Amino acid sequence: MALELDPRLPIIVGTGQIMIRDAATEPLEPAELMAEALRRAETDSGGTGLLTGADQVLTVSELSWRYRNPALAVAERIGASPRRLATSVVGGNLAGVMVARAAADIQAGAADVIVITGGEATRTRSRLRKAGLEAAWSIQSDSVESPESIGDLRPLVNEMESARGVQLPVHVYPLFEVALRARLGLSVDGHIERIGSLWSAFSEVASTNLNAWLRTPLSSSEITTPSAENRMIAWPYTKRLCSNNQVDQGAAVIITSVAAAERAGVPRDRWVFLHAGAEAIDHWNVSNRVDLCSSPALRTAGRDAYSLAERGPDDITHFDLYSCFPSAVQIGAIELGLIPATNVNGAGWGGIGASRPLTVTGGMTFAGGPYNNYVTHGLATMVDTLRNDAGSMGLCTANGGYTTEHAVLLASTEPPTAGAYRHSNPQAEVDALPRVECDDTWTGDVVIESATVVFEDVSMRSLIATRTPEGQRAWGMSTDADFMDAAMTTELVGARAQRSANGTIALD
């Protein structure tokens, strides 16, 4: 006897992805990429009337063009007159957050059909700028009202952090990487080989993904060795270890209730049930975190997502962990219980992701990293993966800032054993966790916590995290050639040093 389903259960019924890579294809502006991804999602669903009947149109913040109301621009293109128009602020976590909350809205009866989409035309915009041209894309009237905003508008860094160079993700995630290497007790060379192997495995996955931007598999050495095509960005990250935002891509998902899917004529084999979603934010400023290579918020959100779905790490077959940089993937894998937090004779580390790949797309270097919208691509690909492996469970994570903001989603072609979608936001628990104070006035003895070397056009500098004798964090820098060489060839974490009044760090 078939299980009777709650007609309010939220399901993903359609996904769409678009990529414009070849020069012969006319480029599209972001709003049209979003709309076309939604059209493809409706076709994918096999149903009708989903776009025109959408209750909510939600868009992921786009950076390659500015619309006064991107959700309205998309709604007009797909013929929708929704009750709710909303757009996220900047944050790679927010596509995941919107999906998690959309599922909760549908389960609660607040909506029947919600469409979520995002798109970036960064490569086209960059090429136009390089040629001294402006994009002839649509501009909304000044009379158009701004949409509802989803997400946290706080600046990711404070004035002190900004002054000390703790600004760009591509400079901060390497600090996480070095701190993680030290915690695991890995050698410098051995660690480089391991993250190269992880990313090489990601490139293999991308080679089979028809929606991936770069589909040529690369070896570990091709990824980690600097070259003219693969410059060093910030030690230990080369260009091929960083997210690739120079893409023209769009992705979309359509989420409905079971009842709405049946009314629209969506075949049962297109349904993917959302089982659980959880979201949480770590201490906002990196300066205040207890360490640089963990994420209590992701750990807590993951715990809740597992519990609400009545599943554990061993029950998950398919993963797509947020992959802006290798440290994000590794921290995610540790916090979700997929690999050990310590390097016990190399167990679970050298083969990270070998038995169960940690990506279904190939990751943000190879599949593409369209700024805030990667997670929509990851979820769309996960839906296809689950449809092709009926009954299996998939897990997607979303990450914004500097492993700051997180969302976790669990889904399957089978309905949730709990009989309903469940959602959690354990923010109060995370906020109550210990925090570290920062002392930017400290001079004297410090212990190095992490260090990277930032490679700029004609110069290099080291960005350094240290701890004072009282345990406070103090940021520092160095342009000394010997210090920078040591940072890239030896283990400086735990080394004693001196911090001057201007933040310069010198080894004892």
Spans of model-derived segments:
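Internal, well-ordered alpha-helical segments in soluble enzyme and binding-protein domains
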Residues: M98, V172-F176, V375-G378
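Conserved "HGTGT" condensation-loop signature of ketosynthase/thiolase-family condensing enzymes
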Residues: M1-T87, A104-A111, V115-V253, V258-A260, ...
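Oxidoreductase and adenylate-handling cofactor-binding alpha/beta cores
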Residues: A380-R387
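Gly/Pro-rich active-site capping loops and adjacent beta-alpha segments
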Residues: T404
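Conserved phosphate-binding catalytic cores of ATP/NTP-utilizing and phosphoryl-transfer enzymes
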Residues: G96-A104
